[in-house]
Amino acid sequence: MAQTPAFNKPKVELHVHLDGAIKPETILYYGRKRGIALPADTPEELQNIIGMDKPLSLPEFLAKFDYYMPAIAGCREAVKRIAYEFVEMKAKDGVVYVEVRYSPHLLANSKVEPIPWNQAEGDLTPDEVVSLVNQGLQEGERDFGVKVRSILCCMRHQPSWSSEVVELCKKYREQTVVAIDLAGDETIEGSSLFPGHVKAYAEAVKSGVHRTVHAGEVGSANVVKEAVDTLKTERLGHGYHTLEDATLYNRLRQENMHFEVCPWSSYLTGAWKPDTEHPVVRFKNDQVNYSLNTDDPLIFKSTLDTDYQMTKNEMGFTEEEFKRLNINAAKSSFLPEDEKKELLDLLYKAYGMPSPASAEQCL
């Protein structure tokens, strides 16, 4: 029997990776079609090999992508299809608005140096990847009734890609793209300050491109500080280690910084140690501005309900808190103000709450 959802009302998700949210069936289909060897023959076997049941180190987690990304990257049909199927997945999660992120370069096999996943050079450029993802998302939006926007990721270990990422954000800003992100291994010393990333984020500020950064997931509070002060981020991906620096934490609370929290992910990646209080409990108790997100549901064998069940059953989260955090997620989304107001009105109505005059103030 299916589990009753922990929060059976419309939800907003702001932190989920497209390449970590692919159906195993789709991976197998393109592996076979393209003659690319995969470590399993059935969706169930593949899910178990790619998926995680217990915490792994960051390198072990990242190695999961090596199993299946060669089946998808460099293939136009596959790139568009995973975007379309992503929207279907989110409709099943009860999500009404989602921002999905990905690195265009990691799905390309042309005009990208180095070519990822040991692919031979082909003719799918990062620019065309964005166009294909946009098409898939827009078709999914139409068919499944979920509003979707996208975020393009710079990669910490590849600062040479970042200038193109911000230019693609500008080029496709009218077609789903709303922001830039910095993802990858934040333990790479000084990677927030690599000139390629700093210049791209400065250009984003100048051009009015919204900004988020993975920081303080496994990295220190100092990485968070760099994201806020140097990269001028508007939101933090994870941000858990902010709590190590009380001055920084209090400042970010006052500035109403939004934390994109991924509870189940944080357990499986070792970002959170289960014998300690989860940072999201502190965020809840302090009434901080945060959201709940899946991060990489394919690898974590999860749905958005997994994160809601975890916080409800193990951390005492209430329906009122779930409403509050989703309203804050909507307010912290990268939608233009008129669309943000529409989203908020939808949530207030669904939650049986009066709609305040202004959507500016977070709860």
From Swiss-Prot:
Any one of the GO CC terms: cytosol
Cofactor note: Binds 1 zinc ion per subunit.
Record: residues binding substrate: 17, 19, 184, 296
Site location (Important for catalytic activity): 238
Annotated catalytic residues: 217 (proton donor)
GO biological process: adenosine catabolic process; cell adhesion; hypoxanthine salvage; inosine biosynthetic process; negative regulation of adenosine receptor signaling pathway; nucleotide metabolic process; purine ribonucleoside monophosphate biosynthetic process; T cell activation
Localization: Cell membrane; Cell junction; Cytoplasmic vesicle lumen; Cytoplasm
Modification sites for N-acetylalanine: 2
Membrane association type: Peripheral membrane protein
Cofactor: Zn(2+)
Tissue-by-tissue expression: Expressed in gastrointestinal tissues (at protein level).
EC number: 3.5.4.4
PROSITE patterns listed in its UniProt record: A_DEAMINASE (PS00485)
Site (Important for interaction with adenosine receptors and increasing their affinity for agonists): 58, 62
Any GO MF annotation of the entry: zinc ion binding
InterPro entries hit by this protein: A/AMP_deam_AS, A_deaminase, A_deaminase_dom, Ado/ade_deaminase, Metal_Hydrolase
Modification N6-acetyllysine, positions: 54, 232
Reaction it catalyzes: adenosine + H2O + H(+) = inosine + NH4(+); 2'-deoxyadenosine + H2O + H(+) = 2'-deoxyinosine + NH4(+); cordycepin + H2O + H(+) = 3'-deoxyinosine + NH4(+)
Binding positions for Zn(2+) per the UniProt entry: 15, 17, 214, 295
Complex formation: Interacts with DPP4 (via extracellular domain). Interacts with PLG (via Kringle 4 domain); the interaction stimulates PLG activation when in complex with DPP4.
Described purpose of this protein according to its UniProt entry: Catalyzes the hydrolytic deamination of adenosine and 2-deoxyadenosine. Plays an important role in purine metabolism and in adenosine homeostasis. Modulates signaling by extracellular adenosine, and so contributes indirectly to cellular signaling events. Acts as a positive regulator of T-cell coactivation, by binding DPP4. Its interaction with DPP4 regulates lymphocyte-epithelial cell adhesion. Enhances dendritic cell immunogenicity by affecting dendritic cell costimulatory molecule expression and cytokines and chemokines secretion. Enhances CD4+ T-cell differentiation and proliferation.
Entry similarity comment: Belongs to the metallo-dependent hydrolases superfamily. Adenosine and AMP deaminases family.
UniProt cross-references to NCBIfam families, sorted A to Z: aden_deam
Protein's name according to its UniProt entry: Adenosine deaminase
Organism: Bos taurus
Name of encoding gene: ADA
